[in-house]
Amino acid sequence: MINEFIAKIPKAELLVHIEGSLEPELLLQLAQRNKIKLPYSSVEQIKVAYQFKNLRSFLDLYNAGMQVLVKSEDFYELTLAYLRKAASQNVRHAEISFDAQAHLERGVKLETMIMGMTRAFQEAQKEWQISANLILCFLRNLTEDAAQKVLLQAVEFKDSIAAVGLDSVEMNNPPEKFKAVFDLAREYGFYTVVSAGEDGPPEYIWQALDVLKASRIGYAVRCVEDPDLMNRLNLTATPLTICPVSNVKLQVVKSMQQHPLKKMLEQGLCVTISSDDPAYFGAYVNENFSAASAAMKFRKADVYEMAKNSFLASFLESSKKEKLLSELDKFYAQV
């Protein structure tokens, strides 16, 4: 019963890496088209490879997979495939992260990436009435200077990029390392999102809030270790994009039963659910809702609250938010 409700409720997805939505079939197809040699020759072999042990082994696989993204058409096909799937799950708006630096270092131009992805946005809006924004993420294992160079390129595409973000390996890469580039990004008018408190300590969440002035925090599960931080997040209603299946697959938490999402929700935090890297974790947004619900016994009211939070936490303009919130409330009133 709750799974049917999850499937039908309008929602936004706010933390999804486009490179992480690369399904095995498309990976093989793009590798063949671009003459990229892969260590796999079949979809089955890729599916076996997608069973990883931890964040580092996952990132190795993830970085190898994205080598097949070369031309604008590749980014277009990948993005359109994700948006088709998201629309089928009643995602009405998506905010899609991409790792520009990982592509730039392979000689792919920023314009190539953005042209492909925004063309998919336009087509998806027309075909399935799903809207989308782009978030350009800086890789935190690289330098702040490297991030700043990309930011200066991104300014040319300000109309196509809603926000900048910070992702990749968290440990020993504190948010404060990127203060200057985030200050500059805000001056240019970008929203800011920061992944923090996944495998990094609660202190990184404080830094994301106070040093980088993040509009939204990704993962953030370790906030429950710090009561003062929980109070702060509650008072400020800072949106948190939680990826439950990712957290279990990467062993950030031992099991879904031990996931702190329910506690965060009960304590009034502004939590939303996203898929992170759906192709690698075998779970898009609805599967994330369903897996969390099975372990945490969500009521319809909980699911509604998180769907509402997802629209409120988006970077859509107010009129579009209001329209989607109205659609959500109309749906909820009829169940």
Annotate each PLM feature.
Residues 1-190, 199-204, 211, 216, ...:
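Metal-cofactor-binding active-site regions of metalloenzymes
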Residues 195:
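Short HxH-centered metal-ligating active-site micro-motif
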